[in-house]
Regions:
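N-terminal localization/anchoring segments of enzymes in phospholipid and broader phosphate metabolism
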Residues: 1-202
Length: 202
């Protein structure tokens, strides 16, 4: 709220640090090998991240791999709030530059983040991403990322569904869950979700 922001701005930085908890350092999940492909590990077994105790790095690594792998056809993602220096956005730009079809459903009416989201939308579009803005009179709070791959003559999916924004800063502050899965039924649900959002079918 505006009263909270006014109070927060009125506290000197050094005093704010004294009043805050010691920052928690997120860990890399024990059952994920940091030296192996995250995509291949998710294909073998679902992975559930619990922020802020688990770090966001496994999801970022998943996106980086998707941006580079030749079998990845597309990345679709919903965005409500991004960090000011967003790693997610830069990876999406890299993916588009590598010829992937990148679709971003951007919510421009995220409270207090409107200007930041407009700036990121322009950068994403300039990088070749397809940016859509949802449906009039509705906000999109969904947090979902769908990676579509072609394996032989079949499509397969890696889907990430979570409760938290794709914001590396707040992922270290708020309690959220993030599921990464290769389940086909969830991937098909994700594909249907994005298709319906593209045509405004709610």
């Amino acid at each position: 709220s505006s009263s909270y922001l006014a109070l927060h701005r009125g506290i000197p930085a050094e005093r704010a640090a004294e009043l805050s908890f010691v920052p928690y350092r997120p860990r890399w999940p024990e059952d994920l090998d940091p030296k192996a492909s995250v995509i291949e590990q998710v294909r073998r077994r679902d992975q559930l991240l619990f922020f802020p105790f688990d770090g966001v790095d496994p999801f970022l690594q998943l996106l980086r791999e998707a941006a580079e792998r030749p079998d990845v056809m597309s990345i679709k993602i919903t965005i409500y709030r991004l960090a000011t220096a967003s790693k997610v956005a830069h990876i999406l730009c890299k993916a588009a530059d590598n010829g992937k079809e990148v679709t971003v459903l951007m919510e421009l009416r995220a409270r207090f983040d409107e200007e930041n989201n407009i700036s990121w939308s322009r950068l994403l579009e300039d990088s070749g991403c397809r940016v859509i803005y949802g449906v009039e009179d509705y906000k999109c709070h969904s947090k979902i990322c769908l990676i579509t791959m072609r394996r032989g003559d079949r499509l397969s999916y890696i889907t990430q569904i979570g409760t938290g924004n794709y914001n590396e800063r707040t992922n270290e502050q708020y309690t959220d869950l993030s599921l990464m899965t290769a389940r086909e039924d969830i991937g098909l649900d994700g594909a249907a979700f994005f298709q319906n959002m593209l045509v405004g079918n709610l």
